[in-house]
């Protein structure tokens, strides 16, 4: 799904809509993608001369992608992401990188 279709699922807009495209892999797995352009608000000051996407923004990107997964399971309501376990950041995400979030529903909704 493209960003216009994602807007029908997520309430986020403008600079806080952090999923550019999403796709269902199967009934329990979805992928979301966002390419870091370099002009995003969260890179201003983090860090001058060496921009790195803050971990909290990476978590938000993953959360939004996971809400796209739930869209087909929960109709007529706004999905809210409430929990993450064992999050580890292995490499810095920088301008030009594309973050792909693979989300799996391990609990039945």
Language-model segments: which ranges?
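Terminal leader/tail segments of proteins
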Residues: 13, 21-23, 35-37, 84, ...
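An N-terminal domain-start capping segment
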Residues: 7-14
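Hydrophobic beta-strand-centered segment that forms part of the acyl-chain substrate-binding groove
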Residues: 65-105
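Active-site helix/loop of acyl-thioester processing domains in fatty-acid/polyketide metabolism
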Residues: 22, 53-76
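Catalytic strand-loop segment that frames the active site of acyl-thioester-processing enzymes
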Residues: 14-53
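Short Pro/Gly-enriched beta-strand edge/turn motifs at strand-loop
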Residues: 1-6, 97-101
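Conserved small/polar residues in nucleotide/adenosyl-binding loops
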Residues: 107-109
